[in-house]
Amino acid sequence: MAEPRTLVLLRHGNSDWNQKNLFTGWVDVELSEQGVAEGQRAGELLAESGILPDVLHTSVLIRAIDTANIALKRAGRSWIPVQRTWRLNERHYGALQGKDKAQTLAEYGPEQFATWRRSFDVPPPPIDDDDEYSQSRDPRYADLGDALPRTECLKDVIERMLPYWESDIQPDLASGRTVLVTAHGNSLRALVKHLDGISDADIAELNIPTGIPLVYRLDEDYRPIVPGGEYLDPEAAAAGAAAVAAQGSKK
C-alpha cells in the first residue's frame, strides 16, 4: 500500500475585519494582533507534530500570505517553494463587502442573511465596479478580464478552485510532498466539501476556525483516510468553529 499523502489546510489568522465583524471577501485586509499570534501558534503545532510542509499554496490576499509566512518561520520552513493563486481567494461577497454583519442581519433578517452567508448556490448582490471595495482596478487581477468575480456563492468558489486543485496541488501530493494550503474560510470549505463528499445542504453547517492546522491523510485516489481530517489542536478548533458560526450575532 502506498504511503498516505499529507495535506495541511490552514485558514488565515484573525484579521482586522474579522474583529470588526465585517464581510471581507476579496478586500485585502491585514491580520490583527490575534491573527499574528494564531499564525505563530500554527507554526508551533506543525513543528511539534513533525508535520513539516514541503511546498505552500496560498491565495493572493495578504492575510493568507502573512499567516503562511509567520507559521512557516515558526516551523523552520520559510525556505519552501510557494505558489499563489486567486483561485484560493476567499469567496467574493459582492455588495456585502465592507458591510457590518450584525447590521446586515438586522436590516435584512435572519433568513436572507443566512441565505447570502451560507447558501450553496445563491450569491449576494454583485458589487459595482466603482465601489470602494471593488477589485475592478486591482493590478493583481488585471489578467482575469471578464472572469473577475463581482459576487460568488460557494458553488462558484468550488468551480474556480477545483481546476487548481487538480492541476497544481494534486501533483505535489503525488510526488510525496507534504502540502500546506493556507487560504480562507470559504475556499477551504470548498476544498473540504470536495474531499469529504459533503452534500450541498450539509456544507452550510461546516465552519473552519482561524489559525489551526487541519491535517488530511489521503489515499492514492485523494480520498481522506480519516473523514474530516484531524485538527492539531482539536479543543481550540471546536471553540473557533463555534465562534465562526456565531458571526452576525455580535455587535
From Swiss-Prot:
Pathway terms, separated by semicolons: Carbohydrate degradation; glycolysis; pyruvate from D-glyceraldehyde 3-phosphate: step 3/5
Oxidoreductase found in the keyword field: no
Enzyme class: isomerase
Active-site positions on this chain: 12, 90
A GO BP annotation: glycolytic process
The entry's keywords: Gluconeogenesis, Glycolysis, Isomerase
Enzymatic reactions: (2R)-2-phosphoglycerate = (2R)-3-phosphoglycerate
Gene3D superfamilies for this protein: Phosphoglycerate mutase-like (3.40.50.1240)
Source organism superkingdom: Bacteria
Stretches assigned to coiled coil: none
Entries under Pfam families matching the protein: His_Phos_1
Function: Catalyzes the interconversion of 2-phosphoglycerate and 3-phosphoglycerate.
Family affiliation: Belongs to the phosphoglycerate mutase family. BPG-dependent PGAM subfamily.
Name used for this protein in its record: 2,3-bisphosphoglycerate-dependent phosphoglycerate mutase
